[in-house]
Amino acid sequence: MGYDRASYTDVEPRAPGMHFLRDALGSEALGVTVVEADDGWEGMEHDHADGDHEEVYLLLTGSASLTVDGETVAMDAGDAVRVDPASTRTLTFDADDSRMVIAGAP
């Protein structure tokens, strides 16, 4: 079979509201995460310099802020932001019922 299929709702969150789909899809290079969160949800500050992979954050619904190397980028539904591997980032949701897809790969 040339594809794999998974529903994020069938994947146990590894952190509150975070559904990591890489294993469920059998993906070797691309990580995909769905985040469902309410106002005030904040992710941990991190970077991906060791893995040398960039990430794209796509906000589907709600409102969020992505702080990249100390600069805050406000996001509305439909906005996408790409972040360099070495950049430090922190994600914060600013509205209830927000949903985001994060994809990352080398």
Label each residue range with its predicted role.
Residues 1-31, 38-39, 44:
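A short, N-terminal "cap"/entry segment at the start of jelly-roll beta-barrel domains
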Residues 23, 39, 77, 85, ...:
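Active-site donor-binding loop signature of nucleotide-sugar glycosyltransferases
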Residues 26-28, 67-71, 94:
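Short strand-coil-strand connectors
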Residues 29-31, 53, 97:
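A structure-centric signal for secondary-structure junctions around beta-strands
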Residues 33-35, 79:
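Hydrophobic/aromatic beta-strand elements that line small-molecule binding cavities or substrate pockets
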Residues 35-37, 49-66:
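Short, conserved beta-strand element in jelly-roll/cupin
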Residues 69-86:
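Short acidic-glycine-tyrosine-enriched beta hairpin
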Residues 85-106:
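Ligand-binding loop in jelly-roll beta-barrel domains
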